[in-house]
Swiss-Prot record:
Cofactor binding description: Binds 1 divalent metal cation per subunit.
Organism, scientific name: Cutibacterium acnes (strain DSM 16379 / KPA171202)
UniProt keyword list: Carbohydrate metabolism, Metal-binding, NAD, Oxidoreductase
Broad enzyme group: oxidoreductase
NCBIfam families: pdxA (TIGR00557)
UniProt binding sites for substrate: H141, T142, K278, R296
This protein's name: Putative D-threonate 4-phosphate dehydrogenase
Amino acid sequence: MPKTPLLGITEGDPAGIGPEITVQAIHNMADDRSFIPIVYGDPAIISRACSVTGLSETVRRVTSEEHIEPESNVINVVDTGTVPHADSIEWGSVQELAGRAAIASIEAATDAALSGKTDGVVTSPINKEAIWKTGSEFLGHTEMLGSLCGTPDTDTMFVVSGLKIFFATRHMSLREAVDSIRRDLIDHEIHKALRALKVFGCNSPKLAVAALNPHAGEGGHFGTEEIEVLRPAVKSACAEGHNVVGPVPADSVFHKGVIREYDGVLSLYHDQGHIASKTLDFDGTVSVTAGLPILRTSVDHGTAFDIAGQGAASPMTMQSALHVASDFARFVPVIREEYLPSTGRN
């Protein structure tokens, strides 16, 4: 019988809702025997989160991932030693100490997954400004994890309603994103997406490339990127034997993906894919980082400083991230073989 996956959960920015949704998700999923949770962070912060959410869970400081078993009303925490006193962190504001705590949590959880002590990492939201206050220059989780794992060429993959959504560009202005739509980029992103689809269980994946312009450019009347860049890239991938279609108008491509015409969609810029996924299922959208030698899933929302500390945040996205991680844990051997720098094909 396969062993139950041990999933490491980061506490996120302790000034935000990360600790709250973490403890609530663990509480709500206590009867879910498909995974065992372990939190990386500060016990004082996790205890405070239990208090503001009205939970009576015992927060247990542990020093090792060994012999962790599911236990009712107990949250096991590997102490990263950054915030010994919860009142050092003020709810709902950008603080350097909170940034340092978030980084320490990510580093500890990543190290545990890399060494095989856990089967995956599930990340709570962080605040980029707090991270930058520490002197870090990472744009976010994905870049930090890529650096820690030695695999900087990662790919964000949203899992929503059975569809996998990829991004050719992400954290840049819309103007920069449009200027970035070049043949070399699209060729590269198509192959990365196809590779990820195979790693995550699609043996013969069908990928759609979203169009950039209205009506896929309407024969060049509304833009020429489809003619000059996207269509040639799709044609080249097909010539290599891949099942790639497009460019498909963006107002229909995601719907077609949900009804299983495609396994994945390559969106061209941040909001093109985000708007689609969050409209399809706001609480059920889960971010997966493909290209890492570890399994990493994440909630797809921010720290919500405006409601932090009130016990008002919904844990549904964290529960979705845990559910996807427990399901995808079966792919961990393939993930390591494919993406580990010393053995993979990066």
